[in-house]
């Protein structure tokens, strides 16, 4: 992972691919969900994590099929979230699993490492997943995740965020400790917002026009200075 890449490449609204992961939450969108995701794809983040884990599995399967196709159109990686059976059904070897789910599935793997793969049976691992993300909240979590075969992780929450009201952020020292403890890419999550050219954050209110705004990610430099590969954005991406 080249952590020296710049966030921008010629355009203020072309996010450098290695730096930003977009996290979805359809409940935050003012536009139709697929329309909003197309706007996100036009920013060319490193990946979009389809984190609609409150959906029934059949509904998620249908949505995932459409989102994977949309992401392919824009050459953006789509990471499915939690629904491991959906990933297998769609033969889509890119998934983000909460750490307890990752650990549970690894226990079914005789070799003890999910990245050695799975066939279409969740009990039979045979070279299936190419990218496995997980979420960590301590250095111990991070070390465990790497041992379990995660290929990247999100760590947080780093800054104060409405998504975690009442919970103090873990801060930049925590992020640096996580980054120092593992070899795989770490993406900071929590309180990382998009700033538009009028100095407001995209998470404050949805854009009221169809044109893509000029944007920046003010806190990205801070997290990358701690050794992170980049940052994750939910609210801002669902309202850009």
What are these regions (language model features)?
Residues 99-106, 154-166, 194, 213-240:
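Glycine-rich phosphate-binding active-site loops on the catalytic face of alpha/beta enzymes
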């Amino acid at each position: 992972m080249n952590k020296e890449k710049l966030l921008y490449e010629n355009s203020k609204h072309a996010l450098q691919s290695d730096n930003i992961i977009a996290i979805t939450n359809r409940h935050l969108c003012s536009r139709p969900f697929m329309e909003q995701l197309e706007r996100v794809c036009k920013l060319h983040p490193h990946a979009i994590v389809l984190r609609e884990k409150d959906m029934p599995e059949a509904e998620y399967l249908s949505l995932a099929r459409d989102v994977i196709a949309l992401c392919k159109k824009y050459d953006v990686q789509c990471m499915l979230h939690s629904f491991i059976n959906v990933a297998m059904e769609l033969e889509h070897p890119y998934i983000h699993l909460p750490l307890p789910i990752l650990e549970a599935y690894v226990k079914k793997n005789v070799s003890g490492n999910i990245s050695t793969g799975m066939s279409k049976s969740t009990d039979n691992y045979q070279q299936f997943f190419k990218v496995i993300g997980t979420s960590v909240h301590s250095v111990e979590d991070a070390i465990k995740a790497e041992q379990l075969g995660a290929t990247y992780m999100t760590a947080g929450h780093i800054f104060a965020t409405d998504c975690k009201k009442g919970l103090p952020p873990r801060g930049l020292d925590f992020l640096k400790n996580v980054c120092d403890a593992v070899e795989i890419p770490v993406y900071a999550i929590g309180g990382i917002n998009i700033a538009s050219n009028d100095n407001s954050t995209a998470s404050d209110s949805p854009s009221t026009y169809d044109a893509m705004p000029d944007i920046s990610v003010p806190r990205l430099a801070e997290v990358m200075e701690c050794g992170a590969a980049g940052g994750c954005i939910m609210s801002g991406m669902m309202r850009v």
